[in-house]
């Protein structure tokens, strides 16, 4: 992957949302260590806030993404090898499949530290982990395996809920496919899915409460206006009304 980065990509820092988030969490915007933003989940915001207070000057948002990328790659390889062994194939067959996945489909996500692609990499690893679960080992083992897969899916959700949705669809599709192909009993699949649903249900509820707070209304309205004016078509194509709502002007 490092060779891919050096020879096949243009290595540079780009002023994208990731840089803005790293700066805001790091106290580089107005000298305030932020604990909330409209993109990442509340729990991740609290974690970044605490780490920045304890060890300031570190780009913790980028560190968290690098950790998520490493864990996602490791989980994909390990899960592919376990799945191969369950199919009575040599472990190297799973390793080869995982390497093909990492270099073929996941290379861009693993070598671009952007929260959207990091979420995609974590979601892909979650599907690998789901397929590798031994669903015949009983309900407790099924729940543990599903939660292990759900943790990777949860990492994608914490980074960016919108980017996590495609991974969620693939995860649910893999769950249904396991049942239809009779690779796993439906009761075990249901127990695993229910455990993951509880985890996400609590997180969605916490996020909804935070977003509904009156003090967030003006900030969220400004972000919505800015997104409409700038992100969809650029400043040149933005209407004057949209620019005015975001506090900008055509000039």
Where are these regions (language model features)?
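Extracytoplasmic loop-helix module adjacent to an early transmembrane segment
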Residues: 2-37, 48-53
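Short hydrophobic/aromatic helix or loop-helix immediately within or flanking a transmembrane segment
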Residues: 34-59, 63-68
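Aromatic- and kink-enriched transmembrane "portal" helix at the membrane-lumen/periplasm boundary
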Residues: 58, 95-121, 154, 158
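Transmembrane-helix motifs of polytopic, lipid-linked glycan transferases
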Residues: 67-87
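Membrane-interfacial entry segments at the cytosolic side of transmembrane helices
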Residues: 87-90, 139-144, 180-197
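Membrane-interface alpha helices of multi-pass inner-membrane proteins
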Residues: 144-160, 172, 195-202
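Transmembrane-embedded, aromatic-rich helix segments that form part
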Residues: 161-177
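Juxtamembrane membrane-water interface segments immediately following transmembrane helices
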Residues: 165, 188-251
